[in-house]
Amino acid sequence: MQLVTAAEMQTIDNYTVETIGMPQDVLIERAAMSVIDVIGAGHFNLDHILVLAGLGNNGADGVAISRLLYAQGFNVSLQFVGNVTRAKDSVKHQLDIIEKYGLVHAEKSDFNEATLIIDAIFGTGLNNLLPEGLQKMIKAANHIEKTVIAVDTPTGIDATTGEVRGAALKAHTTVTFGYNKIGLTQRVGGYLSGNVIVKDIGLLTPQDFNFSLPDKENSPSVATS
């Protein structure tokens, strides 16, 4: 199986959007629908779903996921991690959409009430230590051992090295897009990613670049679709 670094994945994302001309909103919707597919195919307790969204494209995926769940009648709460006024335009656009659905994001949610947490805080772009406040929140969430589905990469995991950037949210399942990431198969990242499912959302294939992509044998449980 081909594995990519965070930088290689970013190049693929940029080429797909900027050169090929695939709208970012299309990729976000496909990513969100992929996560919905995984939720529907799994045996998860869906009584109360909490979506934790960051301020970048990973957060935009999370907002779209919350909308799709809400539209299907699920009890879903959306909470932003960070000041939403500083969010990327992709997040703000998704917010405009969910407001028309009548879904309002919460200022703060009780982790204890959630039966399933969707981690859409940070994706593959993380390369620094998480803020101290977020580290504390993650440690608290890990302590109560809730079932977590990570969007693309568990928050706190370096997608290239598998190292923890201060703290990392432990996932039961990680739905990653396009190609599996090296960091989801190595070091503690391989453990904290849980069951990794690779979903095709229409990104450009690495074969179109001069990448030297490593193969990783004996990696953790990985499924593709």
From Swiss-Prot:
One Pfam family, short name: YjeF_N
Protein's UniProt keywords contain Lipoprotein: no
Binding site for (6S)-NADPHX: 57-61, 123-129, 152
UniProt binding sites for K(+): 58, 119, 155
Gene Ontology CC terms: P-body
Cofactor or coenzyme needed: K(+)
A molecular function GO annotation: nucleotide binding
GO biological process: deadenylation-independent decapping of nuclear-transcribed mRNA; P-body assembly
UniProt domain YjeF N-terminal: residue ranges: 9-209
Origin superkingdom: Bacteria
Catalyses which reaction(s): (6R)-NADHX = (6S)-NADHX; (6R)-NADPHX = (6S)-NADPHX
Co-factor: note: Binds 1 potassium ion per subunit.
Alphabetized UniProt keyword annotations: Isomerase, Metal-binding, NAD, NADP, Nucleotide-binding, Potassium
Signal sequence annotation: none
EC number(s) on file: 5.1.99.6
Summary of the function given for this chain in its UniProt record: Catalyzes the epimerization of the S- and R-forms of NAD(P)HX, a damaged form of NAD(P)H that is a result of enzymatic or heat-dependent hydration. This is a prerequisite for the S-specific NAD(P)H-hydrate dehydratase to allow the repair of both epimers of NAD(P)HX.
Matching HAMAP family: NADHX_epimerase
Similarity comment: Belongs to the NnrE/AIBP family.
UniProt xrefs under PANTHER family: ENHANCER OF MRNA-DECAPPING PROTEIN 3 (PTHR13612:SF0)
NCBIfam families for the chain: yjeF_nterm
Name under which the protein is recorded: NAD(P)H-hydrate epimerase
